[in-house]
Amino acid sequence: MKLTFLGAGAWGTALASHAAATNDVVLWGRDPAQLGAIAATHENAAYLPGVKLSARLAVQADFELAVAHAADDPDGIVVVATPVAGLREMTRRLAARSARPVSMLWLCKGFEAGTHLLPHQMVRAELDAAGRTEGFAYGVLSGPSFAREVAQGLPCALTVAGTEPSLADRAQAAFHHHAMRIYGSDDLTGVEVGGAVKNVLAIATGASDGLGLGLNARAALVTRGLAEMTRLGLALGGRVETFMGLAGVGDLILTATGDLSRNRKVGQQLASGQSLEQVLAGLGHVAEGVRCAQAVAELAATHGIEMPIARAVCAVLFDGLSAADAVAQLLQRDARDE
């Protein structure tokens, strides 16, 4: 199968390298020099230093040629591996092509700043505006996965949710091999809400661990955080079983407890007394939990949903509340039934 990956960050590169073992894969990025280095060394030194990539992975600096590689193949898939903020641009560029409709998957997790739209709602809006909804199949690939481990060939399991069963089938054919398992779903909303909210909750568990509050506190935050994720997801149209699966509790556990998690690191460093500006400056890469914390808090308020952990994270990030005071406020909440 022909696959094109748009975005040469850690996750796009890792998944492209995995897919290249059994597929014809092209990787596109905005920096031609970076792509040249990947081709020459089989390493993405900027995002996955020290990890050897598949020698079968090809790179292409020309956007149109890269897209045509997969889009002109009836079974091909274009995989958008940008953050949420770049998804609209990629969709517009794909919709602007005069050629046949594209099958596309995205890897980003979060809500759009300002609109609070989920990724599939953003994509649908762009396709509607371009008059290109006919024939376009699209969906999301999500679940518990650190890019470095995927690039190293370590086992993982992911969920694909799309607008058409055929897209999920093709995604399974492309990625379900070696150490990776792919499970299908038709709950686009649930899969995307799980991927967005878990990043916010991971900041909370990172802060708790940074304050030295122990494993009991971490388990409580993960469990009660899952309840918050589920409440919001159901209000937005997701299904409860999705939040009990890989895209929900699975991704939450990994991101909240794994030391490769950028969002967890944000919480740990905030707990140490660093400002948000200092934390982000030192991080070097995107932490989507920071970007979507405000959206989660505002969506909860709009729908009348109780999400005290997510609200506390938002207050620490943007309102000057210290991590220690946020924990104190959570502990002072009235007793209630689970």
Swiss-Prot record:
UniProt EC number: 1.1.1.94
Residues engaged in binding sn-glycerol 3-phosphate: K109, G143, S145, K198, D251, S261, R262, N263
Key words, A-Z: Cytoplasm, Lipid biosynthesis, Lipid metabolism, NAD, NADP, Nucleotide-binding, Oxidoreductase, Phospholipid biosynthesis, Phospholipid metabolism
GO MF annotation list: glycerol-3-phosphate dehydrogenase [NAD(P)+] activity; NAD binding
Pathway connected to this protein: Membrane lipid metabolism; glycerophospholipid metabolism
Domain of life: Bacteria
One GO biological process term: phospholipid biosynthetic process
Subcellular location, record wording: Cytoplasm
Amino-acid positions noted as binding NADPH in the UniProt annotation, renumbered to this chain: W11, R30, K109, A147, R262, V286, E288
Main subcellular localisation: cytoplasm
Catalytic activity, reaction form: sn-glycerol 3-phosphate + NAD(+) = dihydroxyacetone phosphate + NADH + H(+); sn-glycerol 3-phosphate + NADP(+) = dihydroxyacetone phosphate + NADPH + H(+)
Active site: K198 (proton acceptor)
Enzyme class: oxidoreductase
GO annotation, cellular component aspect: cytosol
Family statement: Belongs to the NAD-dependent glycerol-3-phosphate dehydrogenase family.
UniProt function note: Catalyzes the reduction of the glycolytic intermediate dihydroxyacetone phosphate (DHAP) to sn-glycerol 3-phosphate (G3P), the key precursor for phospholipid synthesis.
Designated name of the protein: Glycerol-3-phosphate dehydrogenase [NAD(P)+]
Phylogenetic lineage: Bacteria, Pseudomonadati, Pseudomonadota, Betaproteobacteria, Burkholderiales
